[in-house]
Amino acid sequence: MSFFFSRQSDISFLLFSESTSTTRNSSQARLLSRLAVDGSKGRAMPVLNTTRATAAASGVDATLTIRDGPVFHGTAFGANSNISGEAVFTTSLVGYPESMTDPSYRGQILVFTQPLIGNYGVPSNQRDEYGLLKYFESPHIQCAGVVVADVAEKYSHWTAVESLSEWCAREGVPVISGVDTRAIVTHLREQGSSLARISIGDEYDADEDEGFIDPGAINLVKRVSTKAPFVVSNPNATFHVALIDCGVKENILRSLVSRGASVTVFPYNYPIHKVADNFDGVFISNGPGDPTHCQETVYNLGRLMETSSVPIMGICLGHQLLALAVGAQTIKLKYGNRAHNIPALDLTTGQCHITSQNHGYAVDASTLPSEFKEYFVNLNDGSNEGMMHKTRPIFSTQFHPEAKGGPMDSSYLFDKYLENVQMYKDNSKVYRDNRPSQLMIDILSKERVGVEPSPLAANAI
């Protein structure tokens, strides 16, 4: 198998062609060398990011202003900067490092209902045997800002290396504490998710609408997706999976690689249908924002299902994009589902799973085409939580079976997906060794390439 690269716009696209030849000309070698250099940046968490870090805003007055809603006064800590975004809330009791680094929260002001946040500090950027972050879901904080009732100034945990305030200041993310989060959540539940702004120091004028940035009007996936392919390899891999990165969490990659798959991660708008037959399966990741912004991805997935019988699985935004690709529609939920304890009913078995969720949009199950059926349903609000093809190895879930944080009730779905992958590989008419060659492992970056950290202040998304 040989690998050829071509550059389209600012994205390096990887194209595969099968060949028994092991010789490569010098010009191709030089191109691969340049790509290797280009792909060596972007994923490693820096010790200090001087472009984002600010002085800690400890003890300074701060204001949370909800557009067309109440104003809450509190105390700032973390970064000394003003931001705006969509105010959403999570009822998760633990897992704030994972939640804050989840790319699905890009552009949002995250309100924690748990009264005390920060008591076990922030862990290190240690990586596992696959080169993936052990304690974070991406290298940087992804939410625009954080709102808590009370913050623990002193922390204690064997993995902790810094406080929540120090971490947020280093990452350039402002936090407001000392506010009534119960009143904030009550407003968001009754009125729906709202645009909001965190102001440090002088109170912000709520009448200045231009100060509120709406992340729903922006293609946030473009901000969090890798700009060039990279590989997460398992030296004993049985499968080779292509993953469409819409803002993939580290634990999704880990859930695949630890089960015997090597994963090649592609940009969200990569024409995956052109190379799908070189892989044993295709996976569509989670991500932030409105799925209708990703029309290129929707088109590519539609073409993929028309031209290939490769097994497909999607999670969260990946579920929504897959639904759009088959002709279904998505809807915006009033205030979304963000928690670690949401019950989802498996309609094929009648079993209930406690699931981890983080989404503001959902698939309208009534619009699913006849060849698909609803897989899971939310027992709290009746919204769709998954779909599956009636005859082909294609399924997706709205919730997160990989958790991080949250329960592992549904982690078996990764096993189900890889069983489909194994069956597809076994049934292939001509056996192909789809494991990545050593050349590919050496050349392709093991980093998420060109992903910009969450900006500051007015550019908070």
UniProtKB/Swiss-Prot annotation:
Which Gene3D superfamilies does its entry note? 3.40.50.880, Carbamoyl-phosphate synthase small subunit, N-terminal domain
State the protein's name. Carbamoyl phosphate synthase arginine-specific small chain
Domain Glutamine amidotransferase type-1, first and last residues per copy: 240-427
Cross-referenced Pfam families, in alphabetical order? CPSase_sm_chain, GATase
| Molecular-function GO terms, alphabetical | ATP binding; carbamoyl-phosphate synthase (glutamine-hydrolyzing) activity; glutaminase activity
Question: Which HAMAP family did the record assign?
Answer: CPSase_S_chain
Organism encoding this protein: Chaetomium globosum (strain ATCC 6205 / CBS 148.51 / DSM 1962 / NBRC 6347 / NRRL 1970) (Soil fungus)
GO BP term, example: 'de novo' pyrimidine nucleobase biosynthetic process
Q: Which InterPro entries match?
A: CarbamoylP_synth_ssu (IPR006274), CarbamoylP_synth_ssu_N (IPR002474), CarbP_synth_ssu_N_sf (IPR036480), Class_I_gatase-like (IPR029062), CPSase_GATase1 (IPR035686), GATASE (IPR017926)
Return the similarity comment.
Belongs to the CarA family.
Q: Which residues does the Swiss-Prot or TrEMBL record annotate as the active site?
A: C316 (nucleophile), H400, E402
Q: Which GO terms describe its cellular component?
A: carbamoyl-phosphate synthase complex
The main place the protein resides is cytoplasm
Q: In which pathway does it act?
A: Amino-acid biosynthesis; L-arginine biosynthesis; carbamoyl phosphate from bicarbonate: step 1/1
Q: Which CDD domains match?
A: GATase1_CPSase
Quaternary form?
Heterodimer composed of 2 chains; the small (or glutamine) chain promotes the hydrolysis of glutamine to ammonia, which is used by the large (or ammonia) chain to synthesize carbamoyl phosphate.
Output the PROSITE patterns linked to this UniProt entry: GATASE_TYPE_1
